[in-house]
Amino acid sequence: MEICLIGGGNHTNNELREVFLELSKMIKPEAKILIIPFATDNSRYESWMASITQAFSIMENVSIELLNEDLSGKEMKKSIMEHDILYFIGGKPERLIHVIEEKGLTPIIKNFQGLIIGYSAGSLAFGHDCIITKDKDYPETIVIKGLGLVMFSVEVHYEDNVDGELFPLSNERKIYAIPNGSAVFSKNGELYKGINDIYSFQYMKKEIVNSKVL
């Protein structure tokens, strides 16, 4: 399983240009992309589809479809199996995890043979532990059970003012902090590539890792 975890950034300007250029090397012409939108409210689906379609327009003849939350679990599983790429969008990671578990999708996602991409909350949900650091939407930092697609945790939209939250959490798990415009790539559970600045937190230590061979 190959996974791309994007920290955040604007799909419609050049902020994610390097990330999508890297993805374009991995995605074959006429690939079928399925958007997993459960982290956000359905009133935002249209704007998400427009921005993601623009971002993928640099790739040749890819098709983009959105997985409707009203489908049954069986219908969702069929749709997932018919696609080459799963793209999990941003919003609230706890909502995303809840719907996936409620619909019984975790096993089929873990066994998916194509490329899985997480953006913001989508990336957060992929970890064994999903860390949600405090901000305007969350008054306190919380840790919930993630989907376990990777054995590390991530911080998205990373800025160094959250280091004080991440250091104590790094005693129990490895955390990769991914700023807007950056991404990490994982294959078979191991990181092998970073795009732009990436930081690791472990045992109360912080390192920049994009300059190293992952």
Task: Identify the role of each PLM range.
Residues M1-P29, A39-A50, Q54, I132, ...:
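C-terminal and late-domain segments of enzyme folds
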Residues K28-I33, N61, H83, Q113:
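A general structural motif
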Residues I33, L86, S120, V154, ...:
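A residue-level signal for conserved active-site and pocket-lining positions in enzyme catalytic cores
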Residues I35, I117-Y119, A177-I178:
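A structural signal for short, well-ordered beta-strand segments and their strand-loop junctions
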Residues N42-M76:
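Class I S-adenosyl-L-methionine
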Residues E46, K77, V99, H128-D129, ...:
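Short, well-ordered secondary-structure micro-motifs
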Residues E65-I116:
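Flexible gly/pro-rich beta->alpha loop and the following alpha-helix that scaffold active-site loops
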Residues R95-D160:
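Class I SAM-dependent methyltransferase SAM-binding "motif I" and its flanking Rossmann-like core
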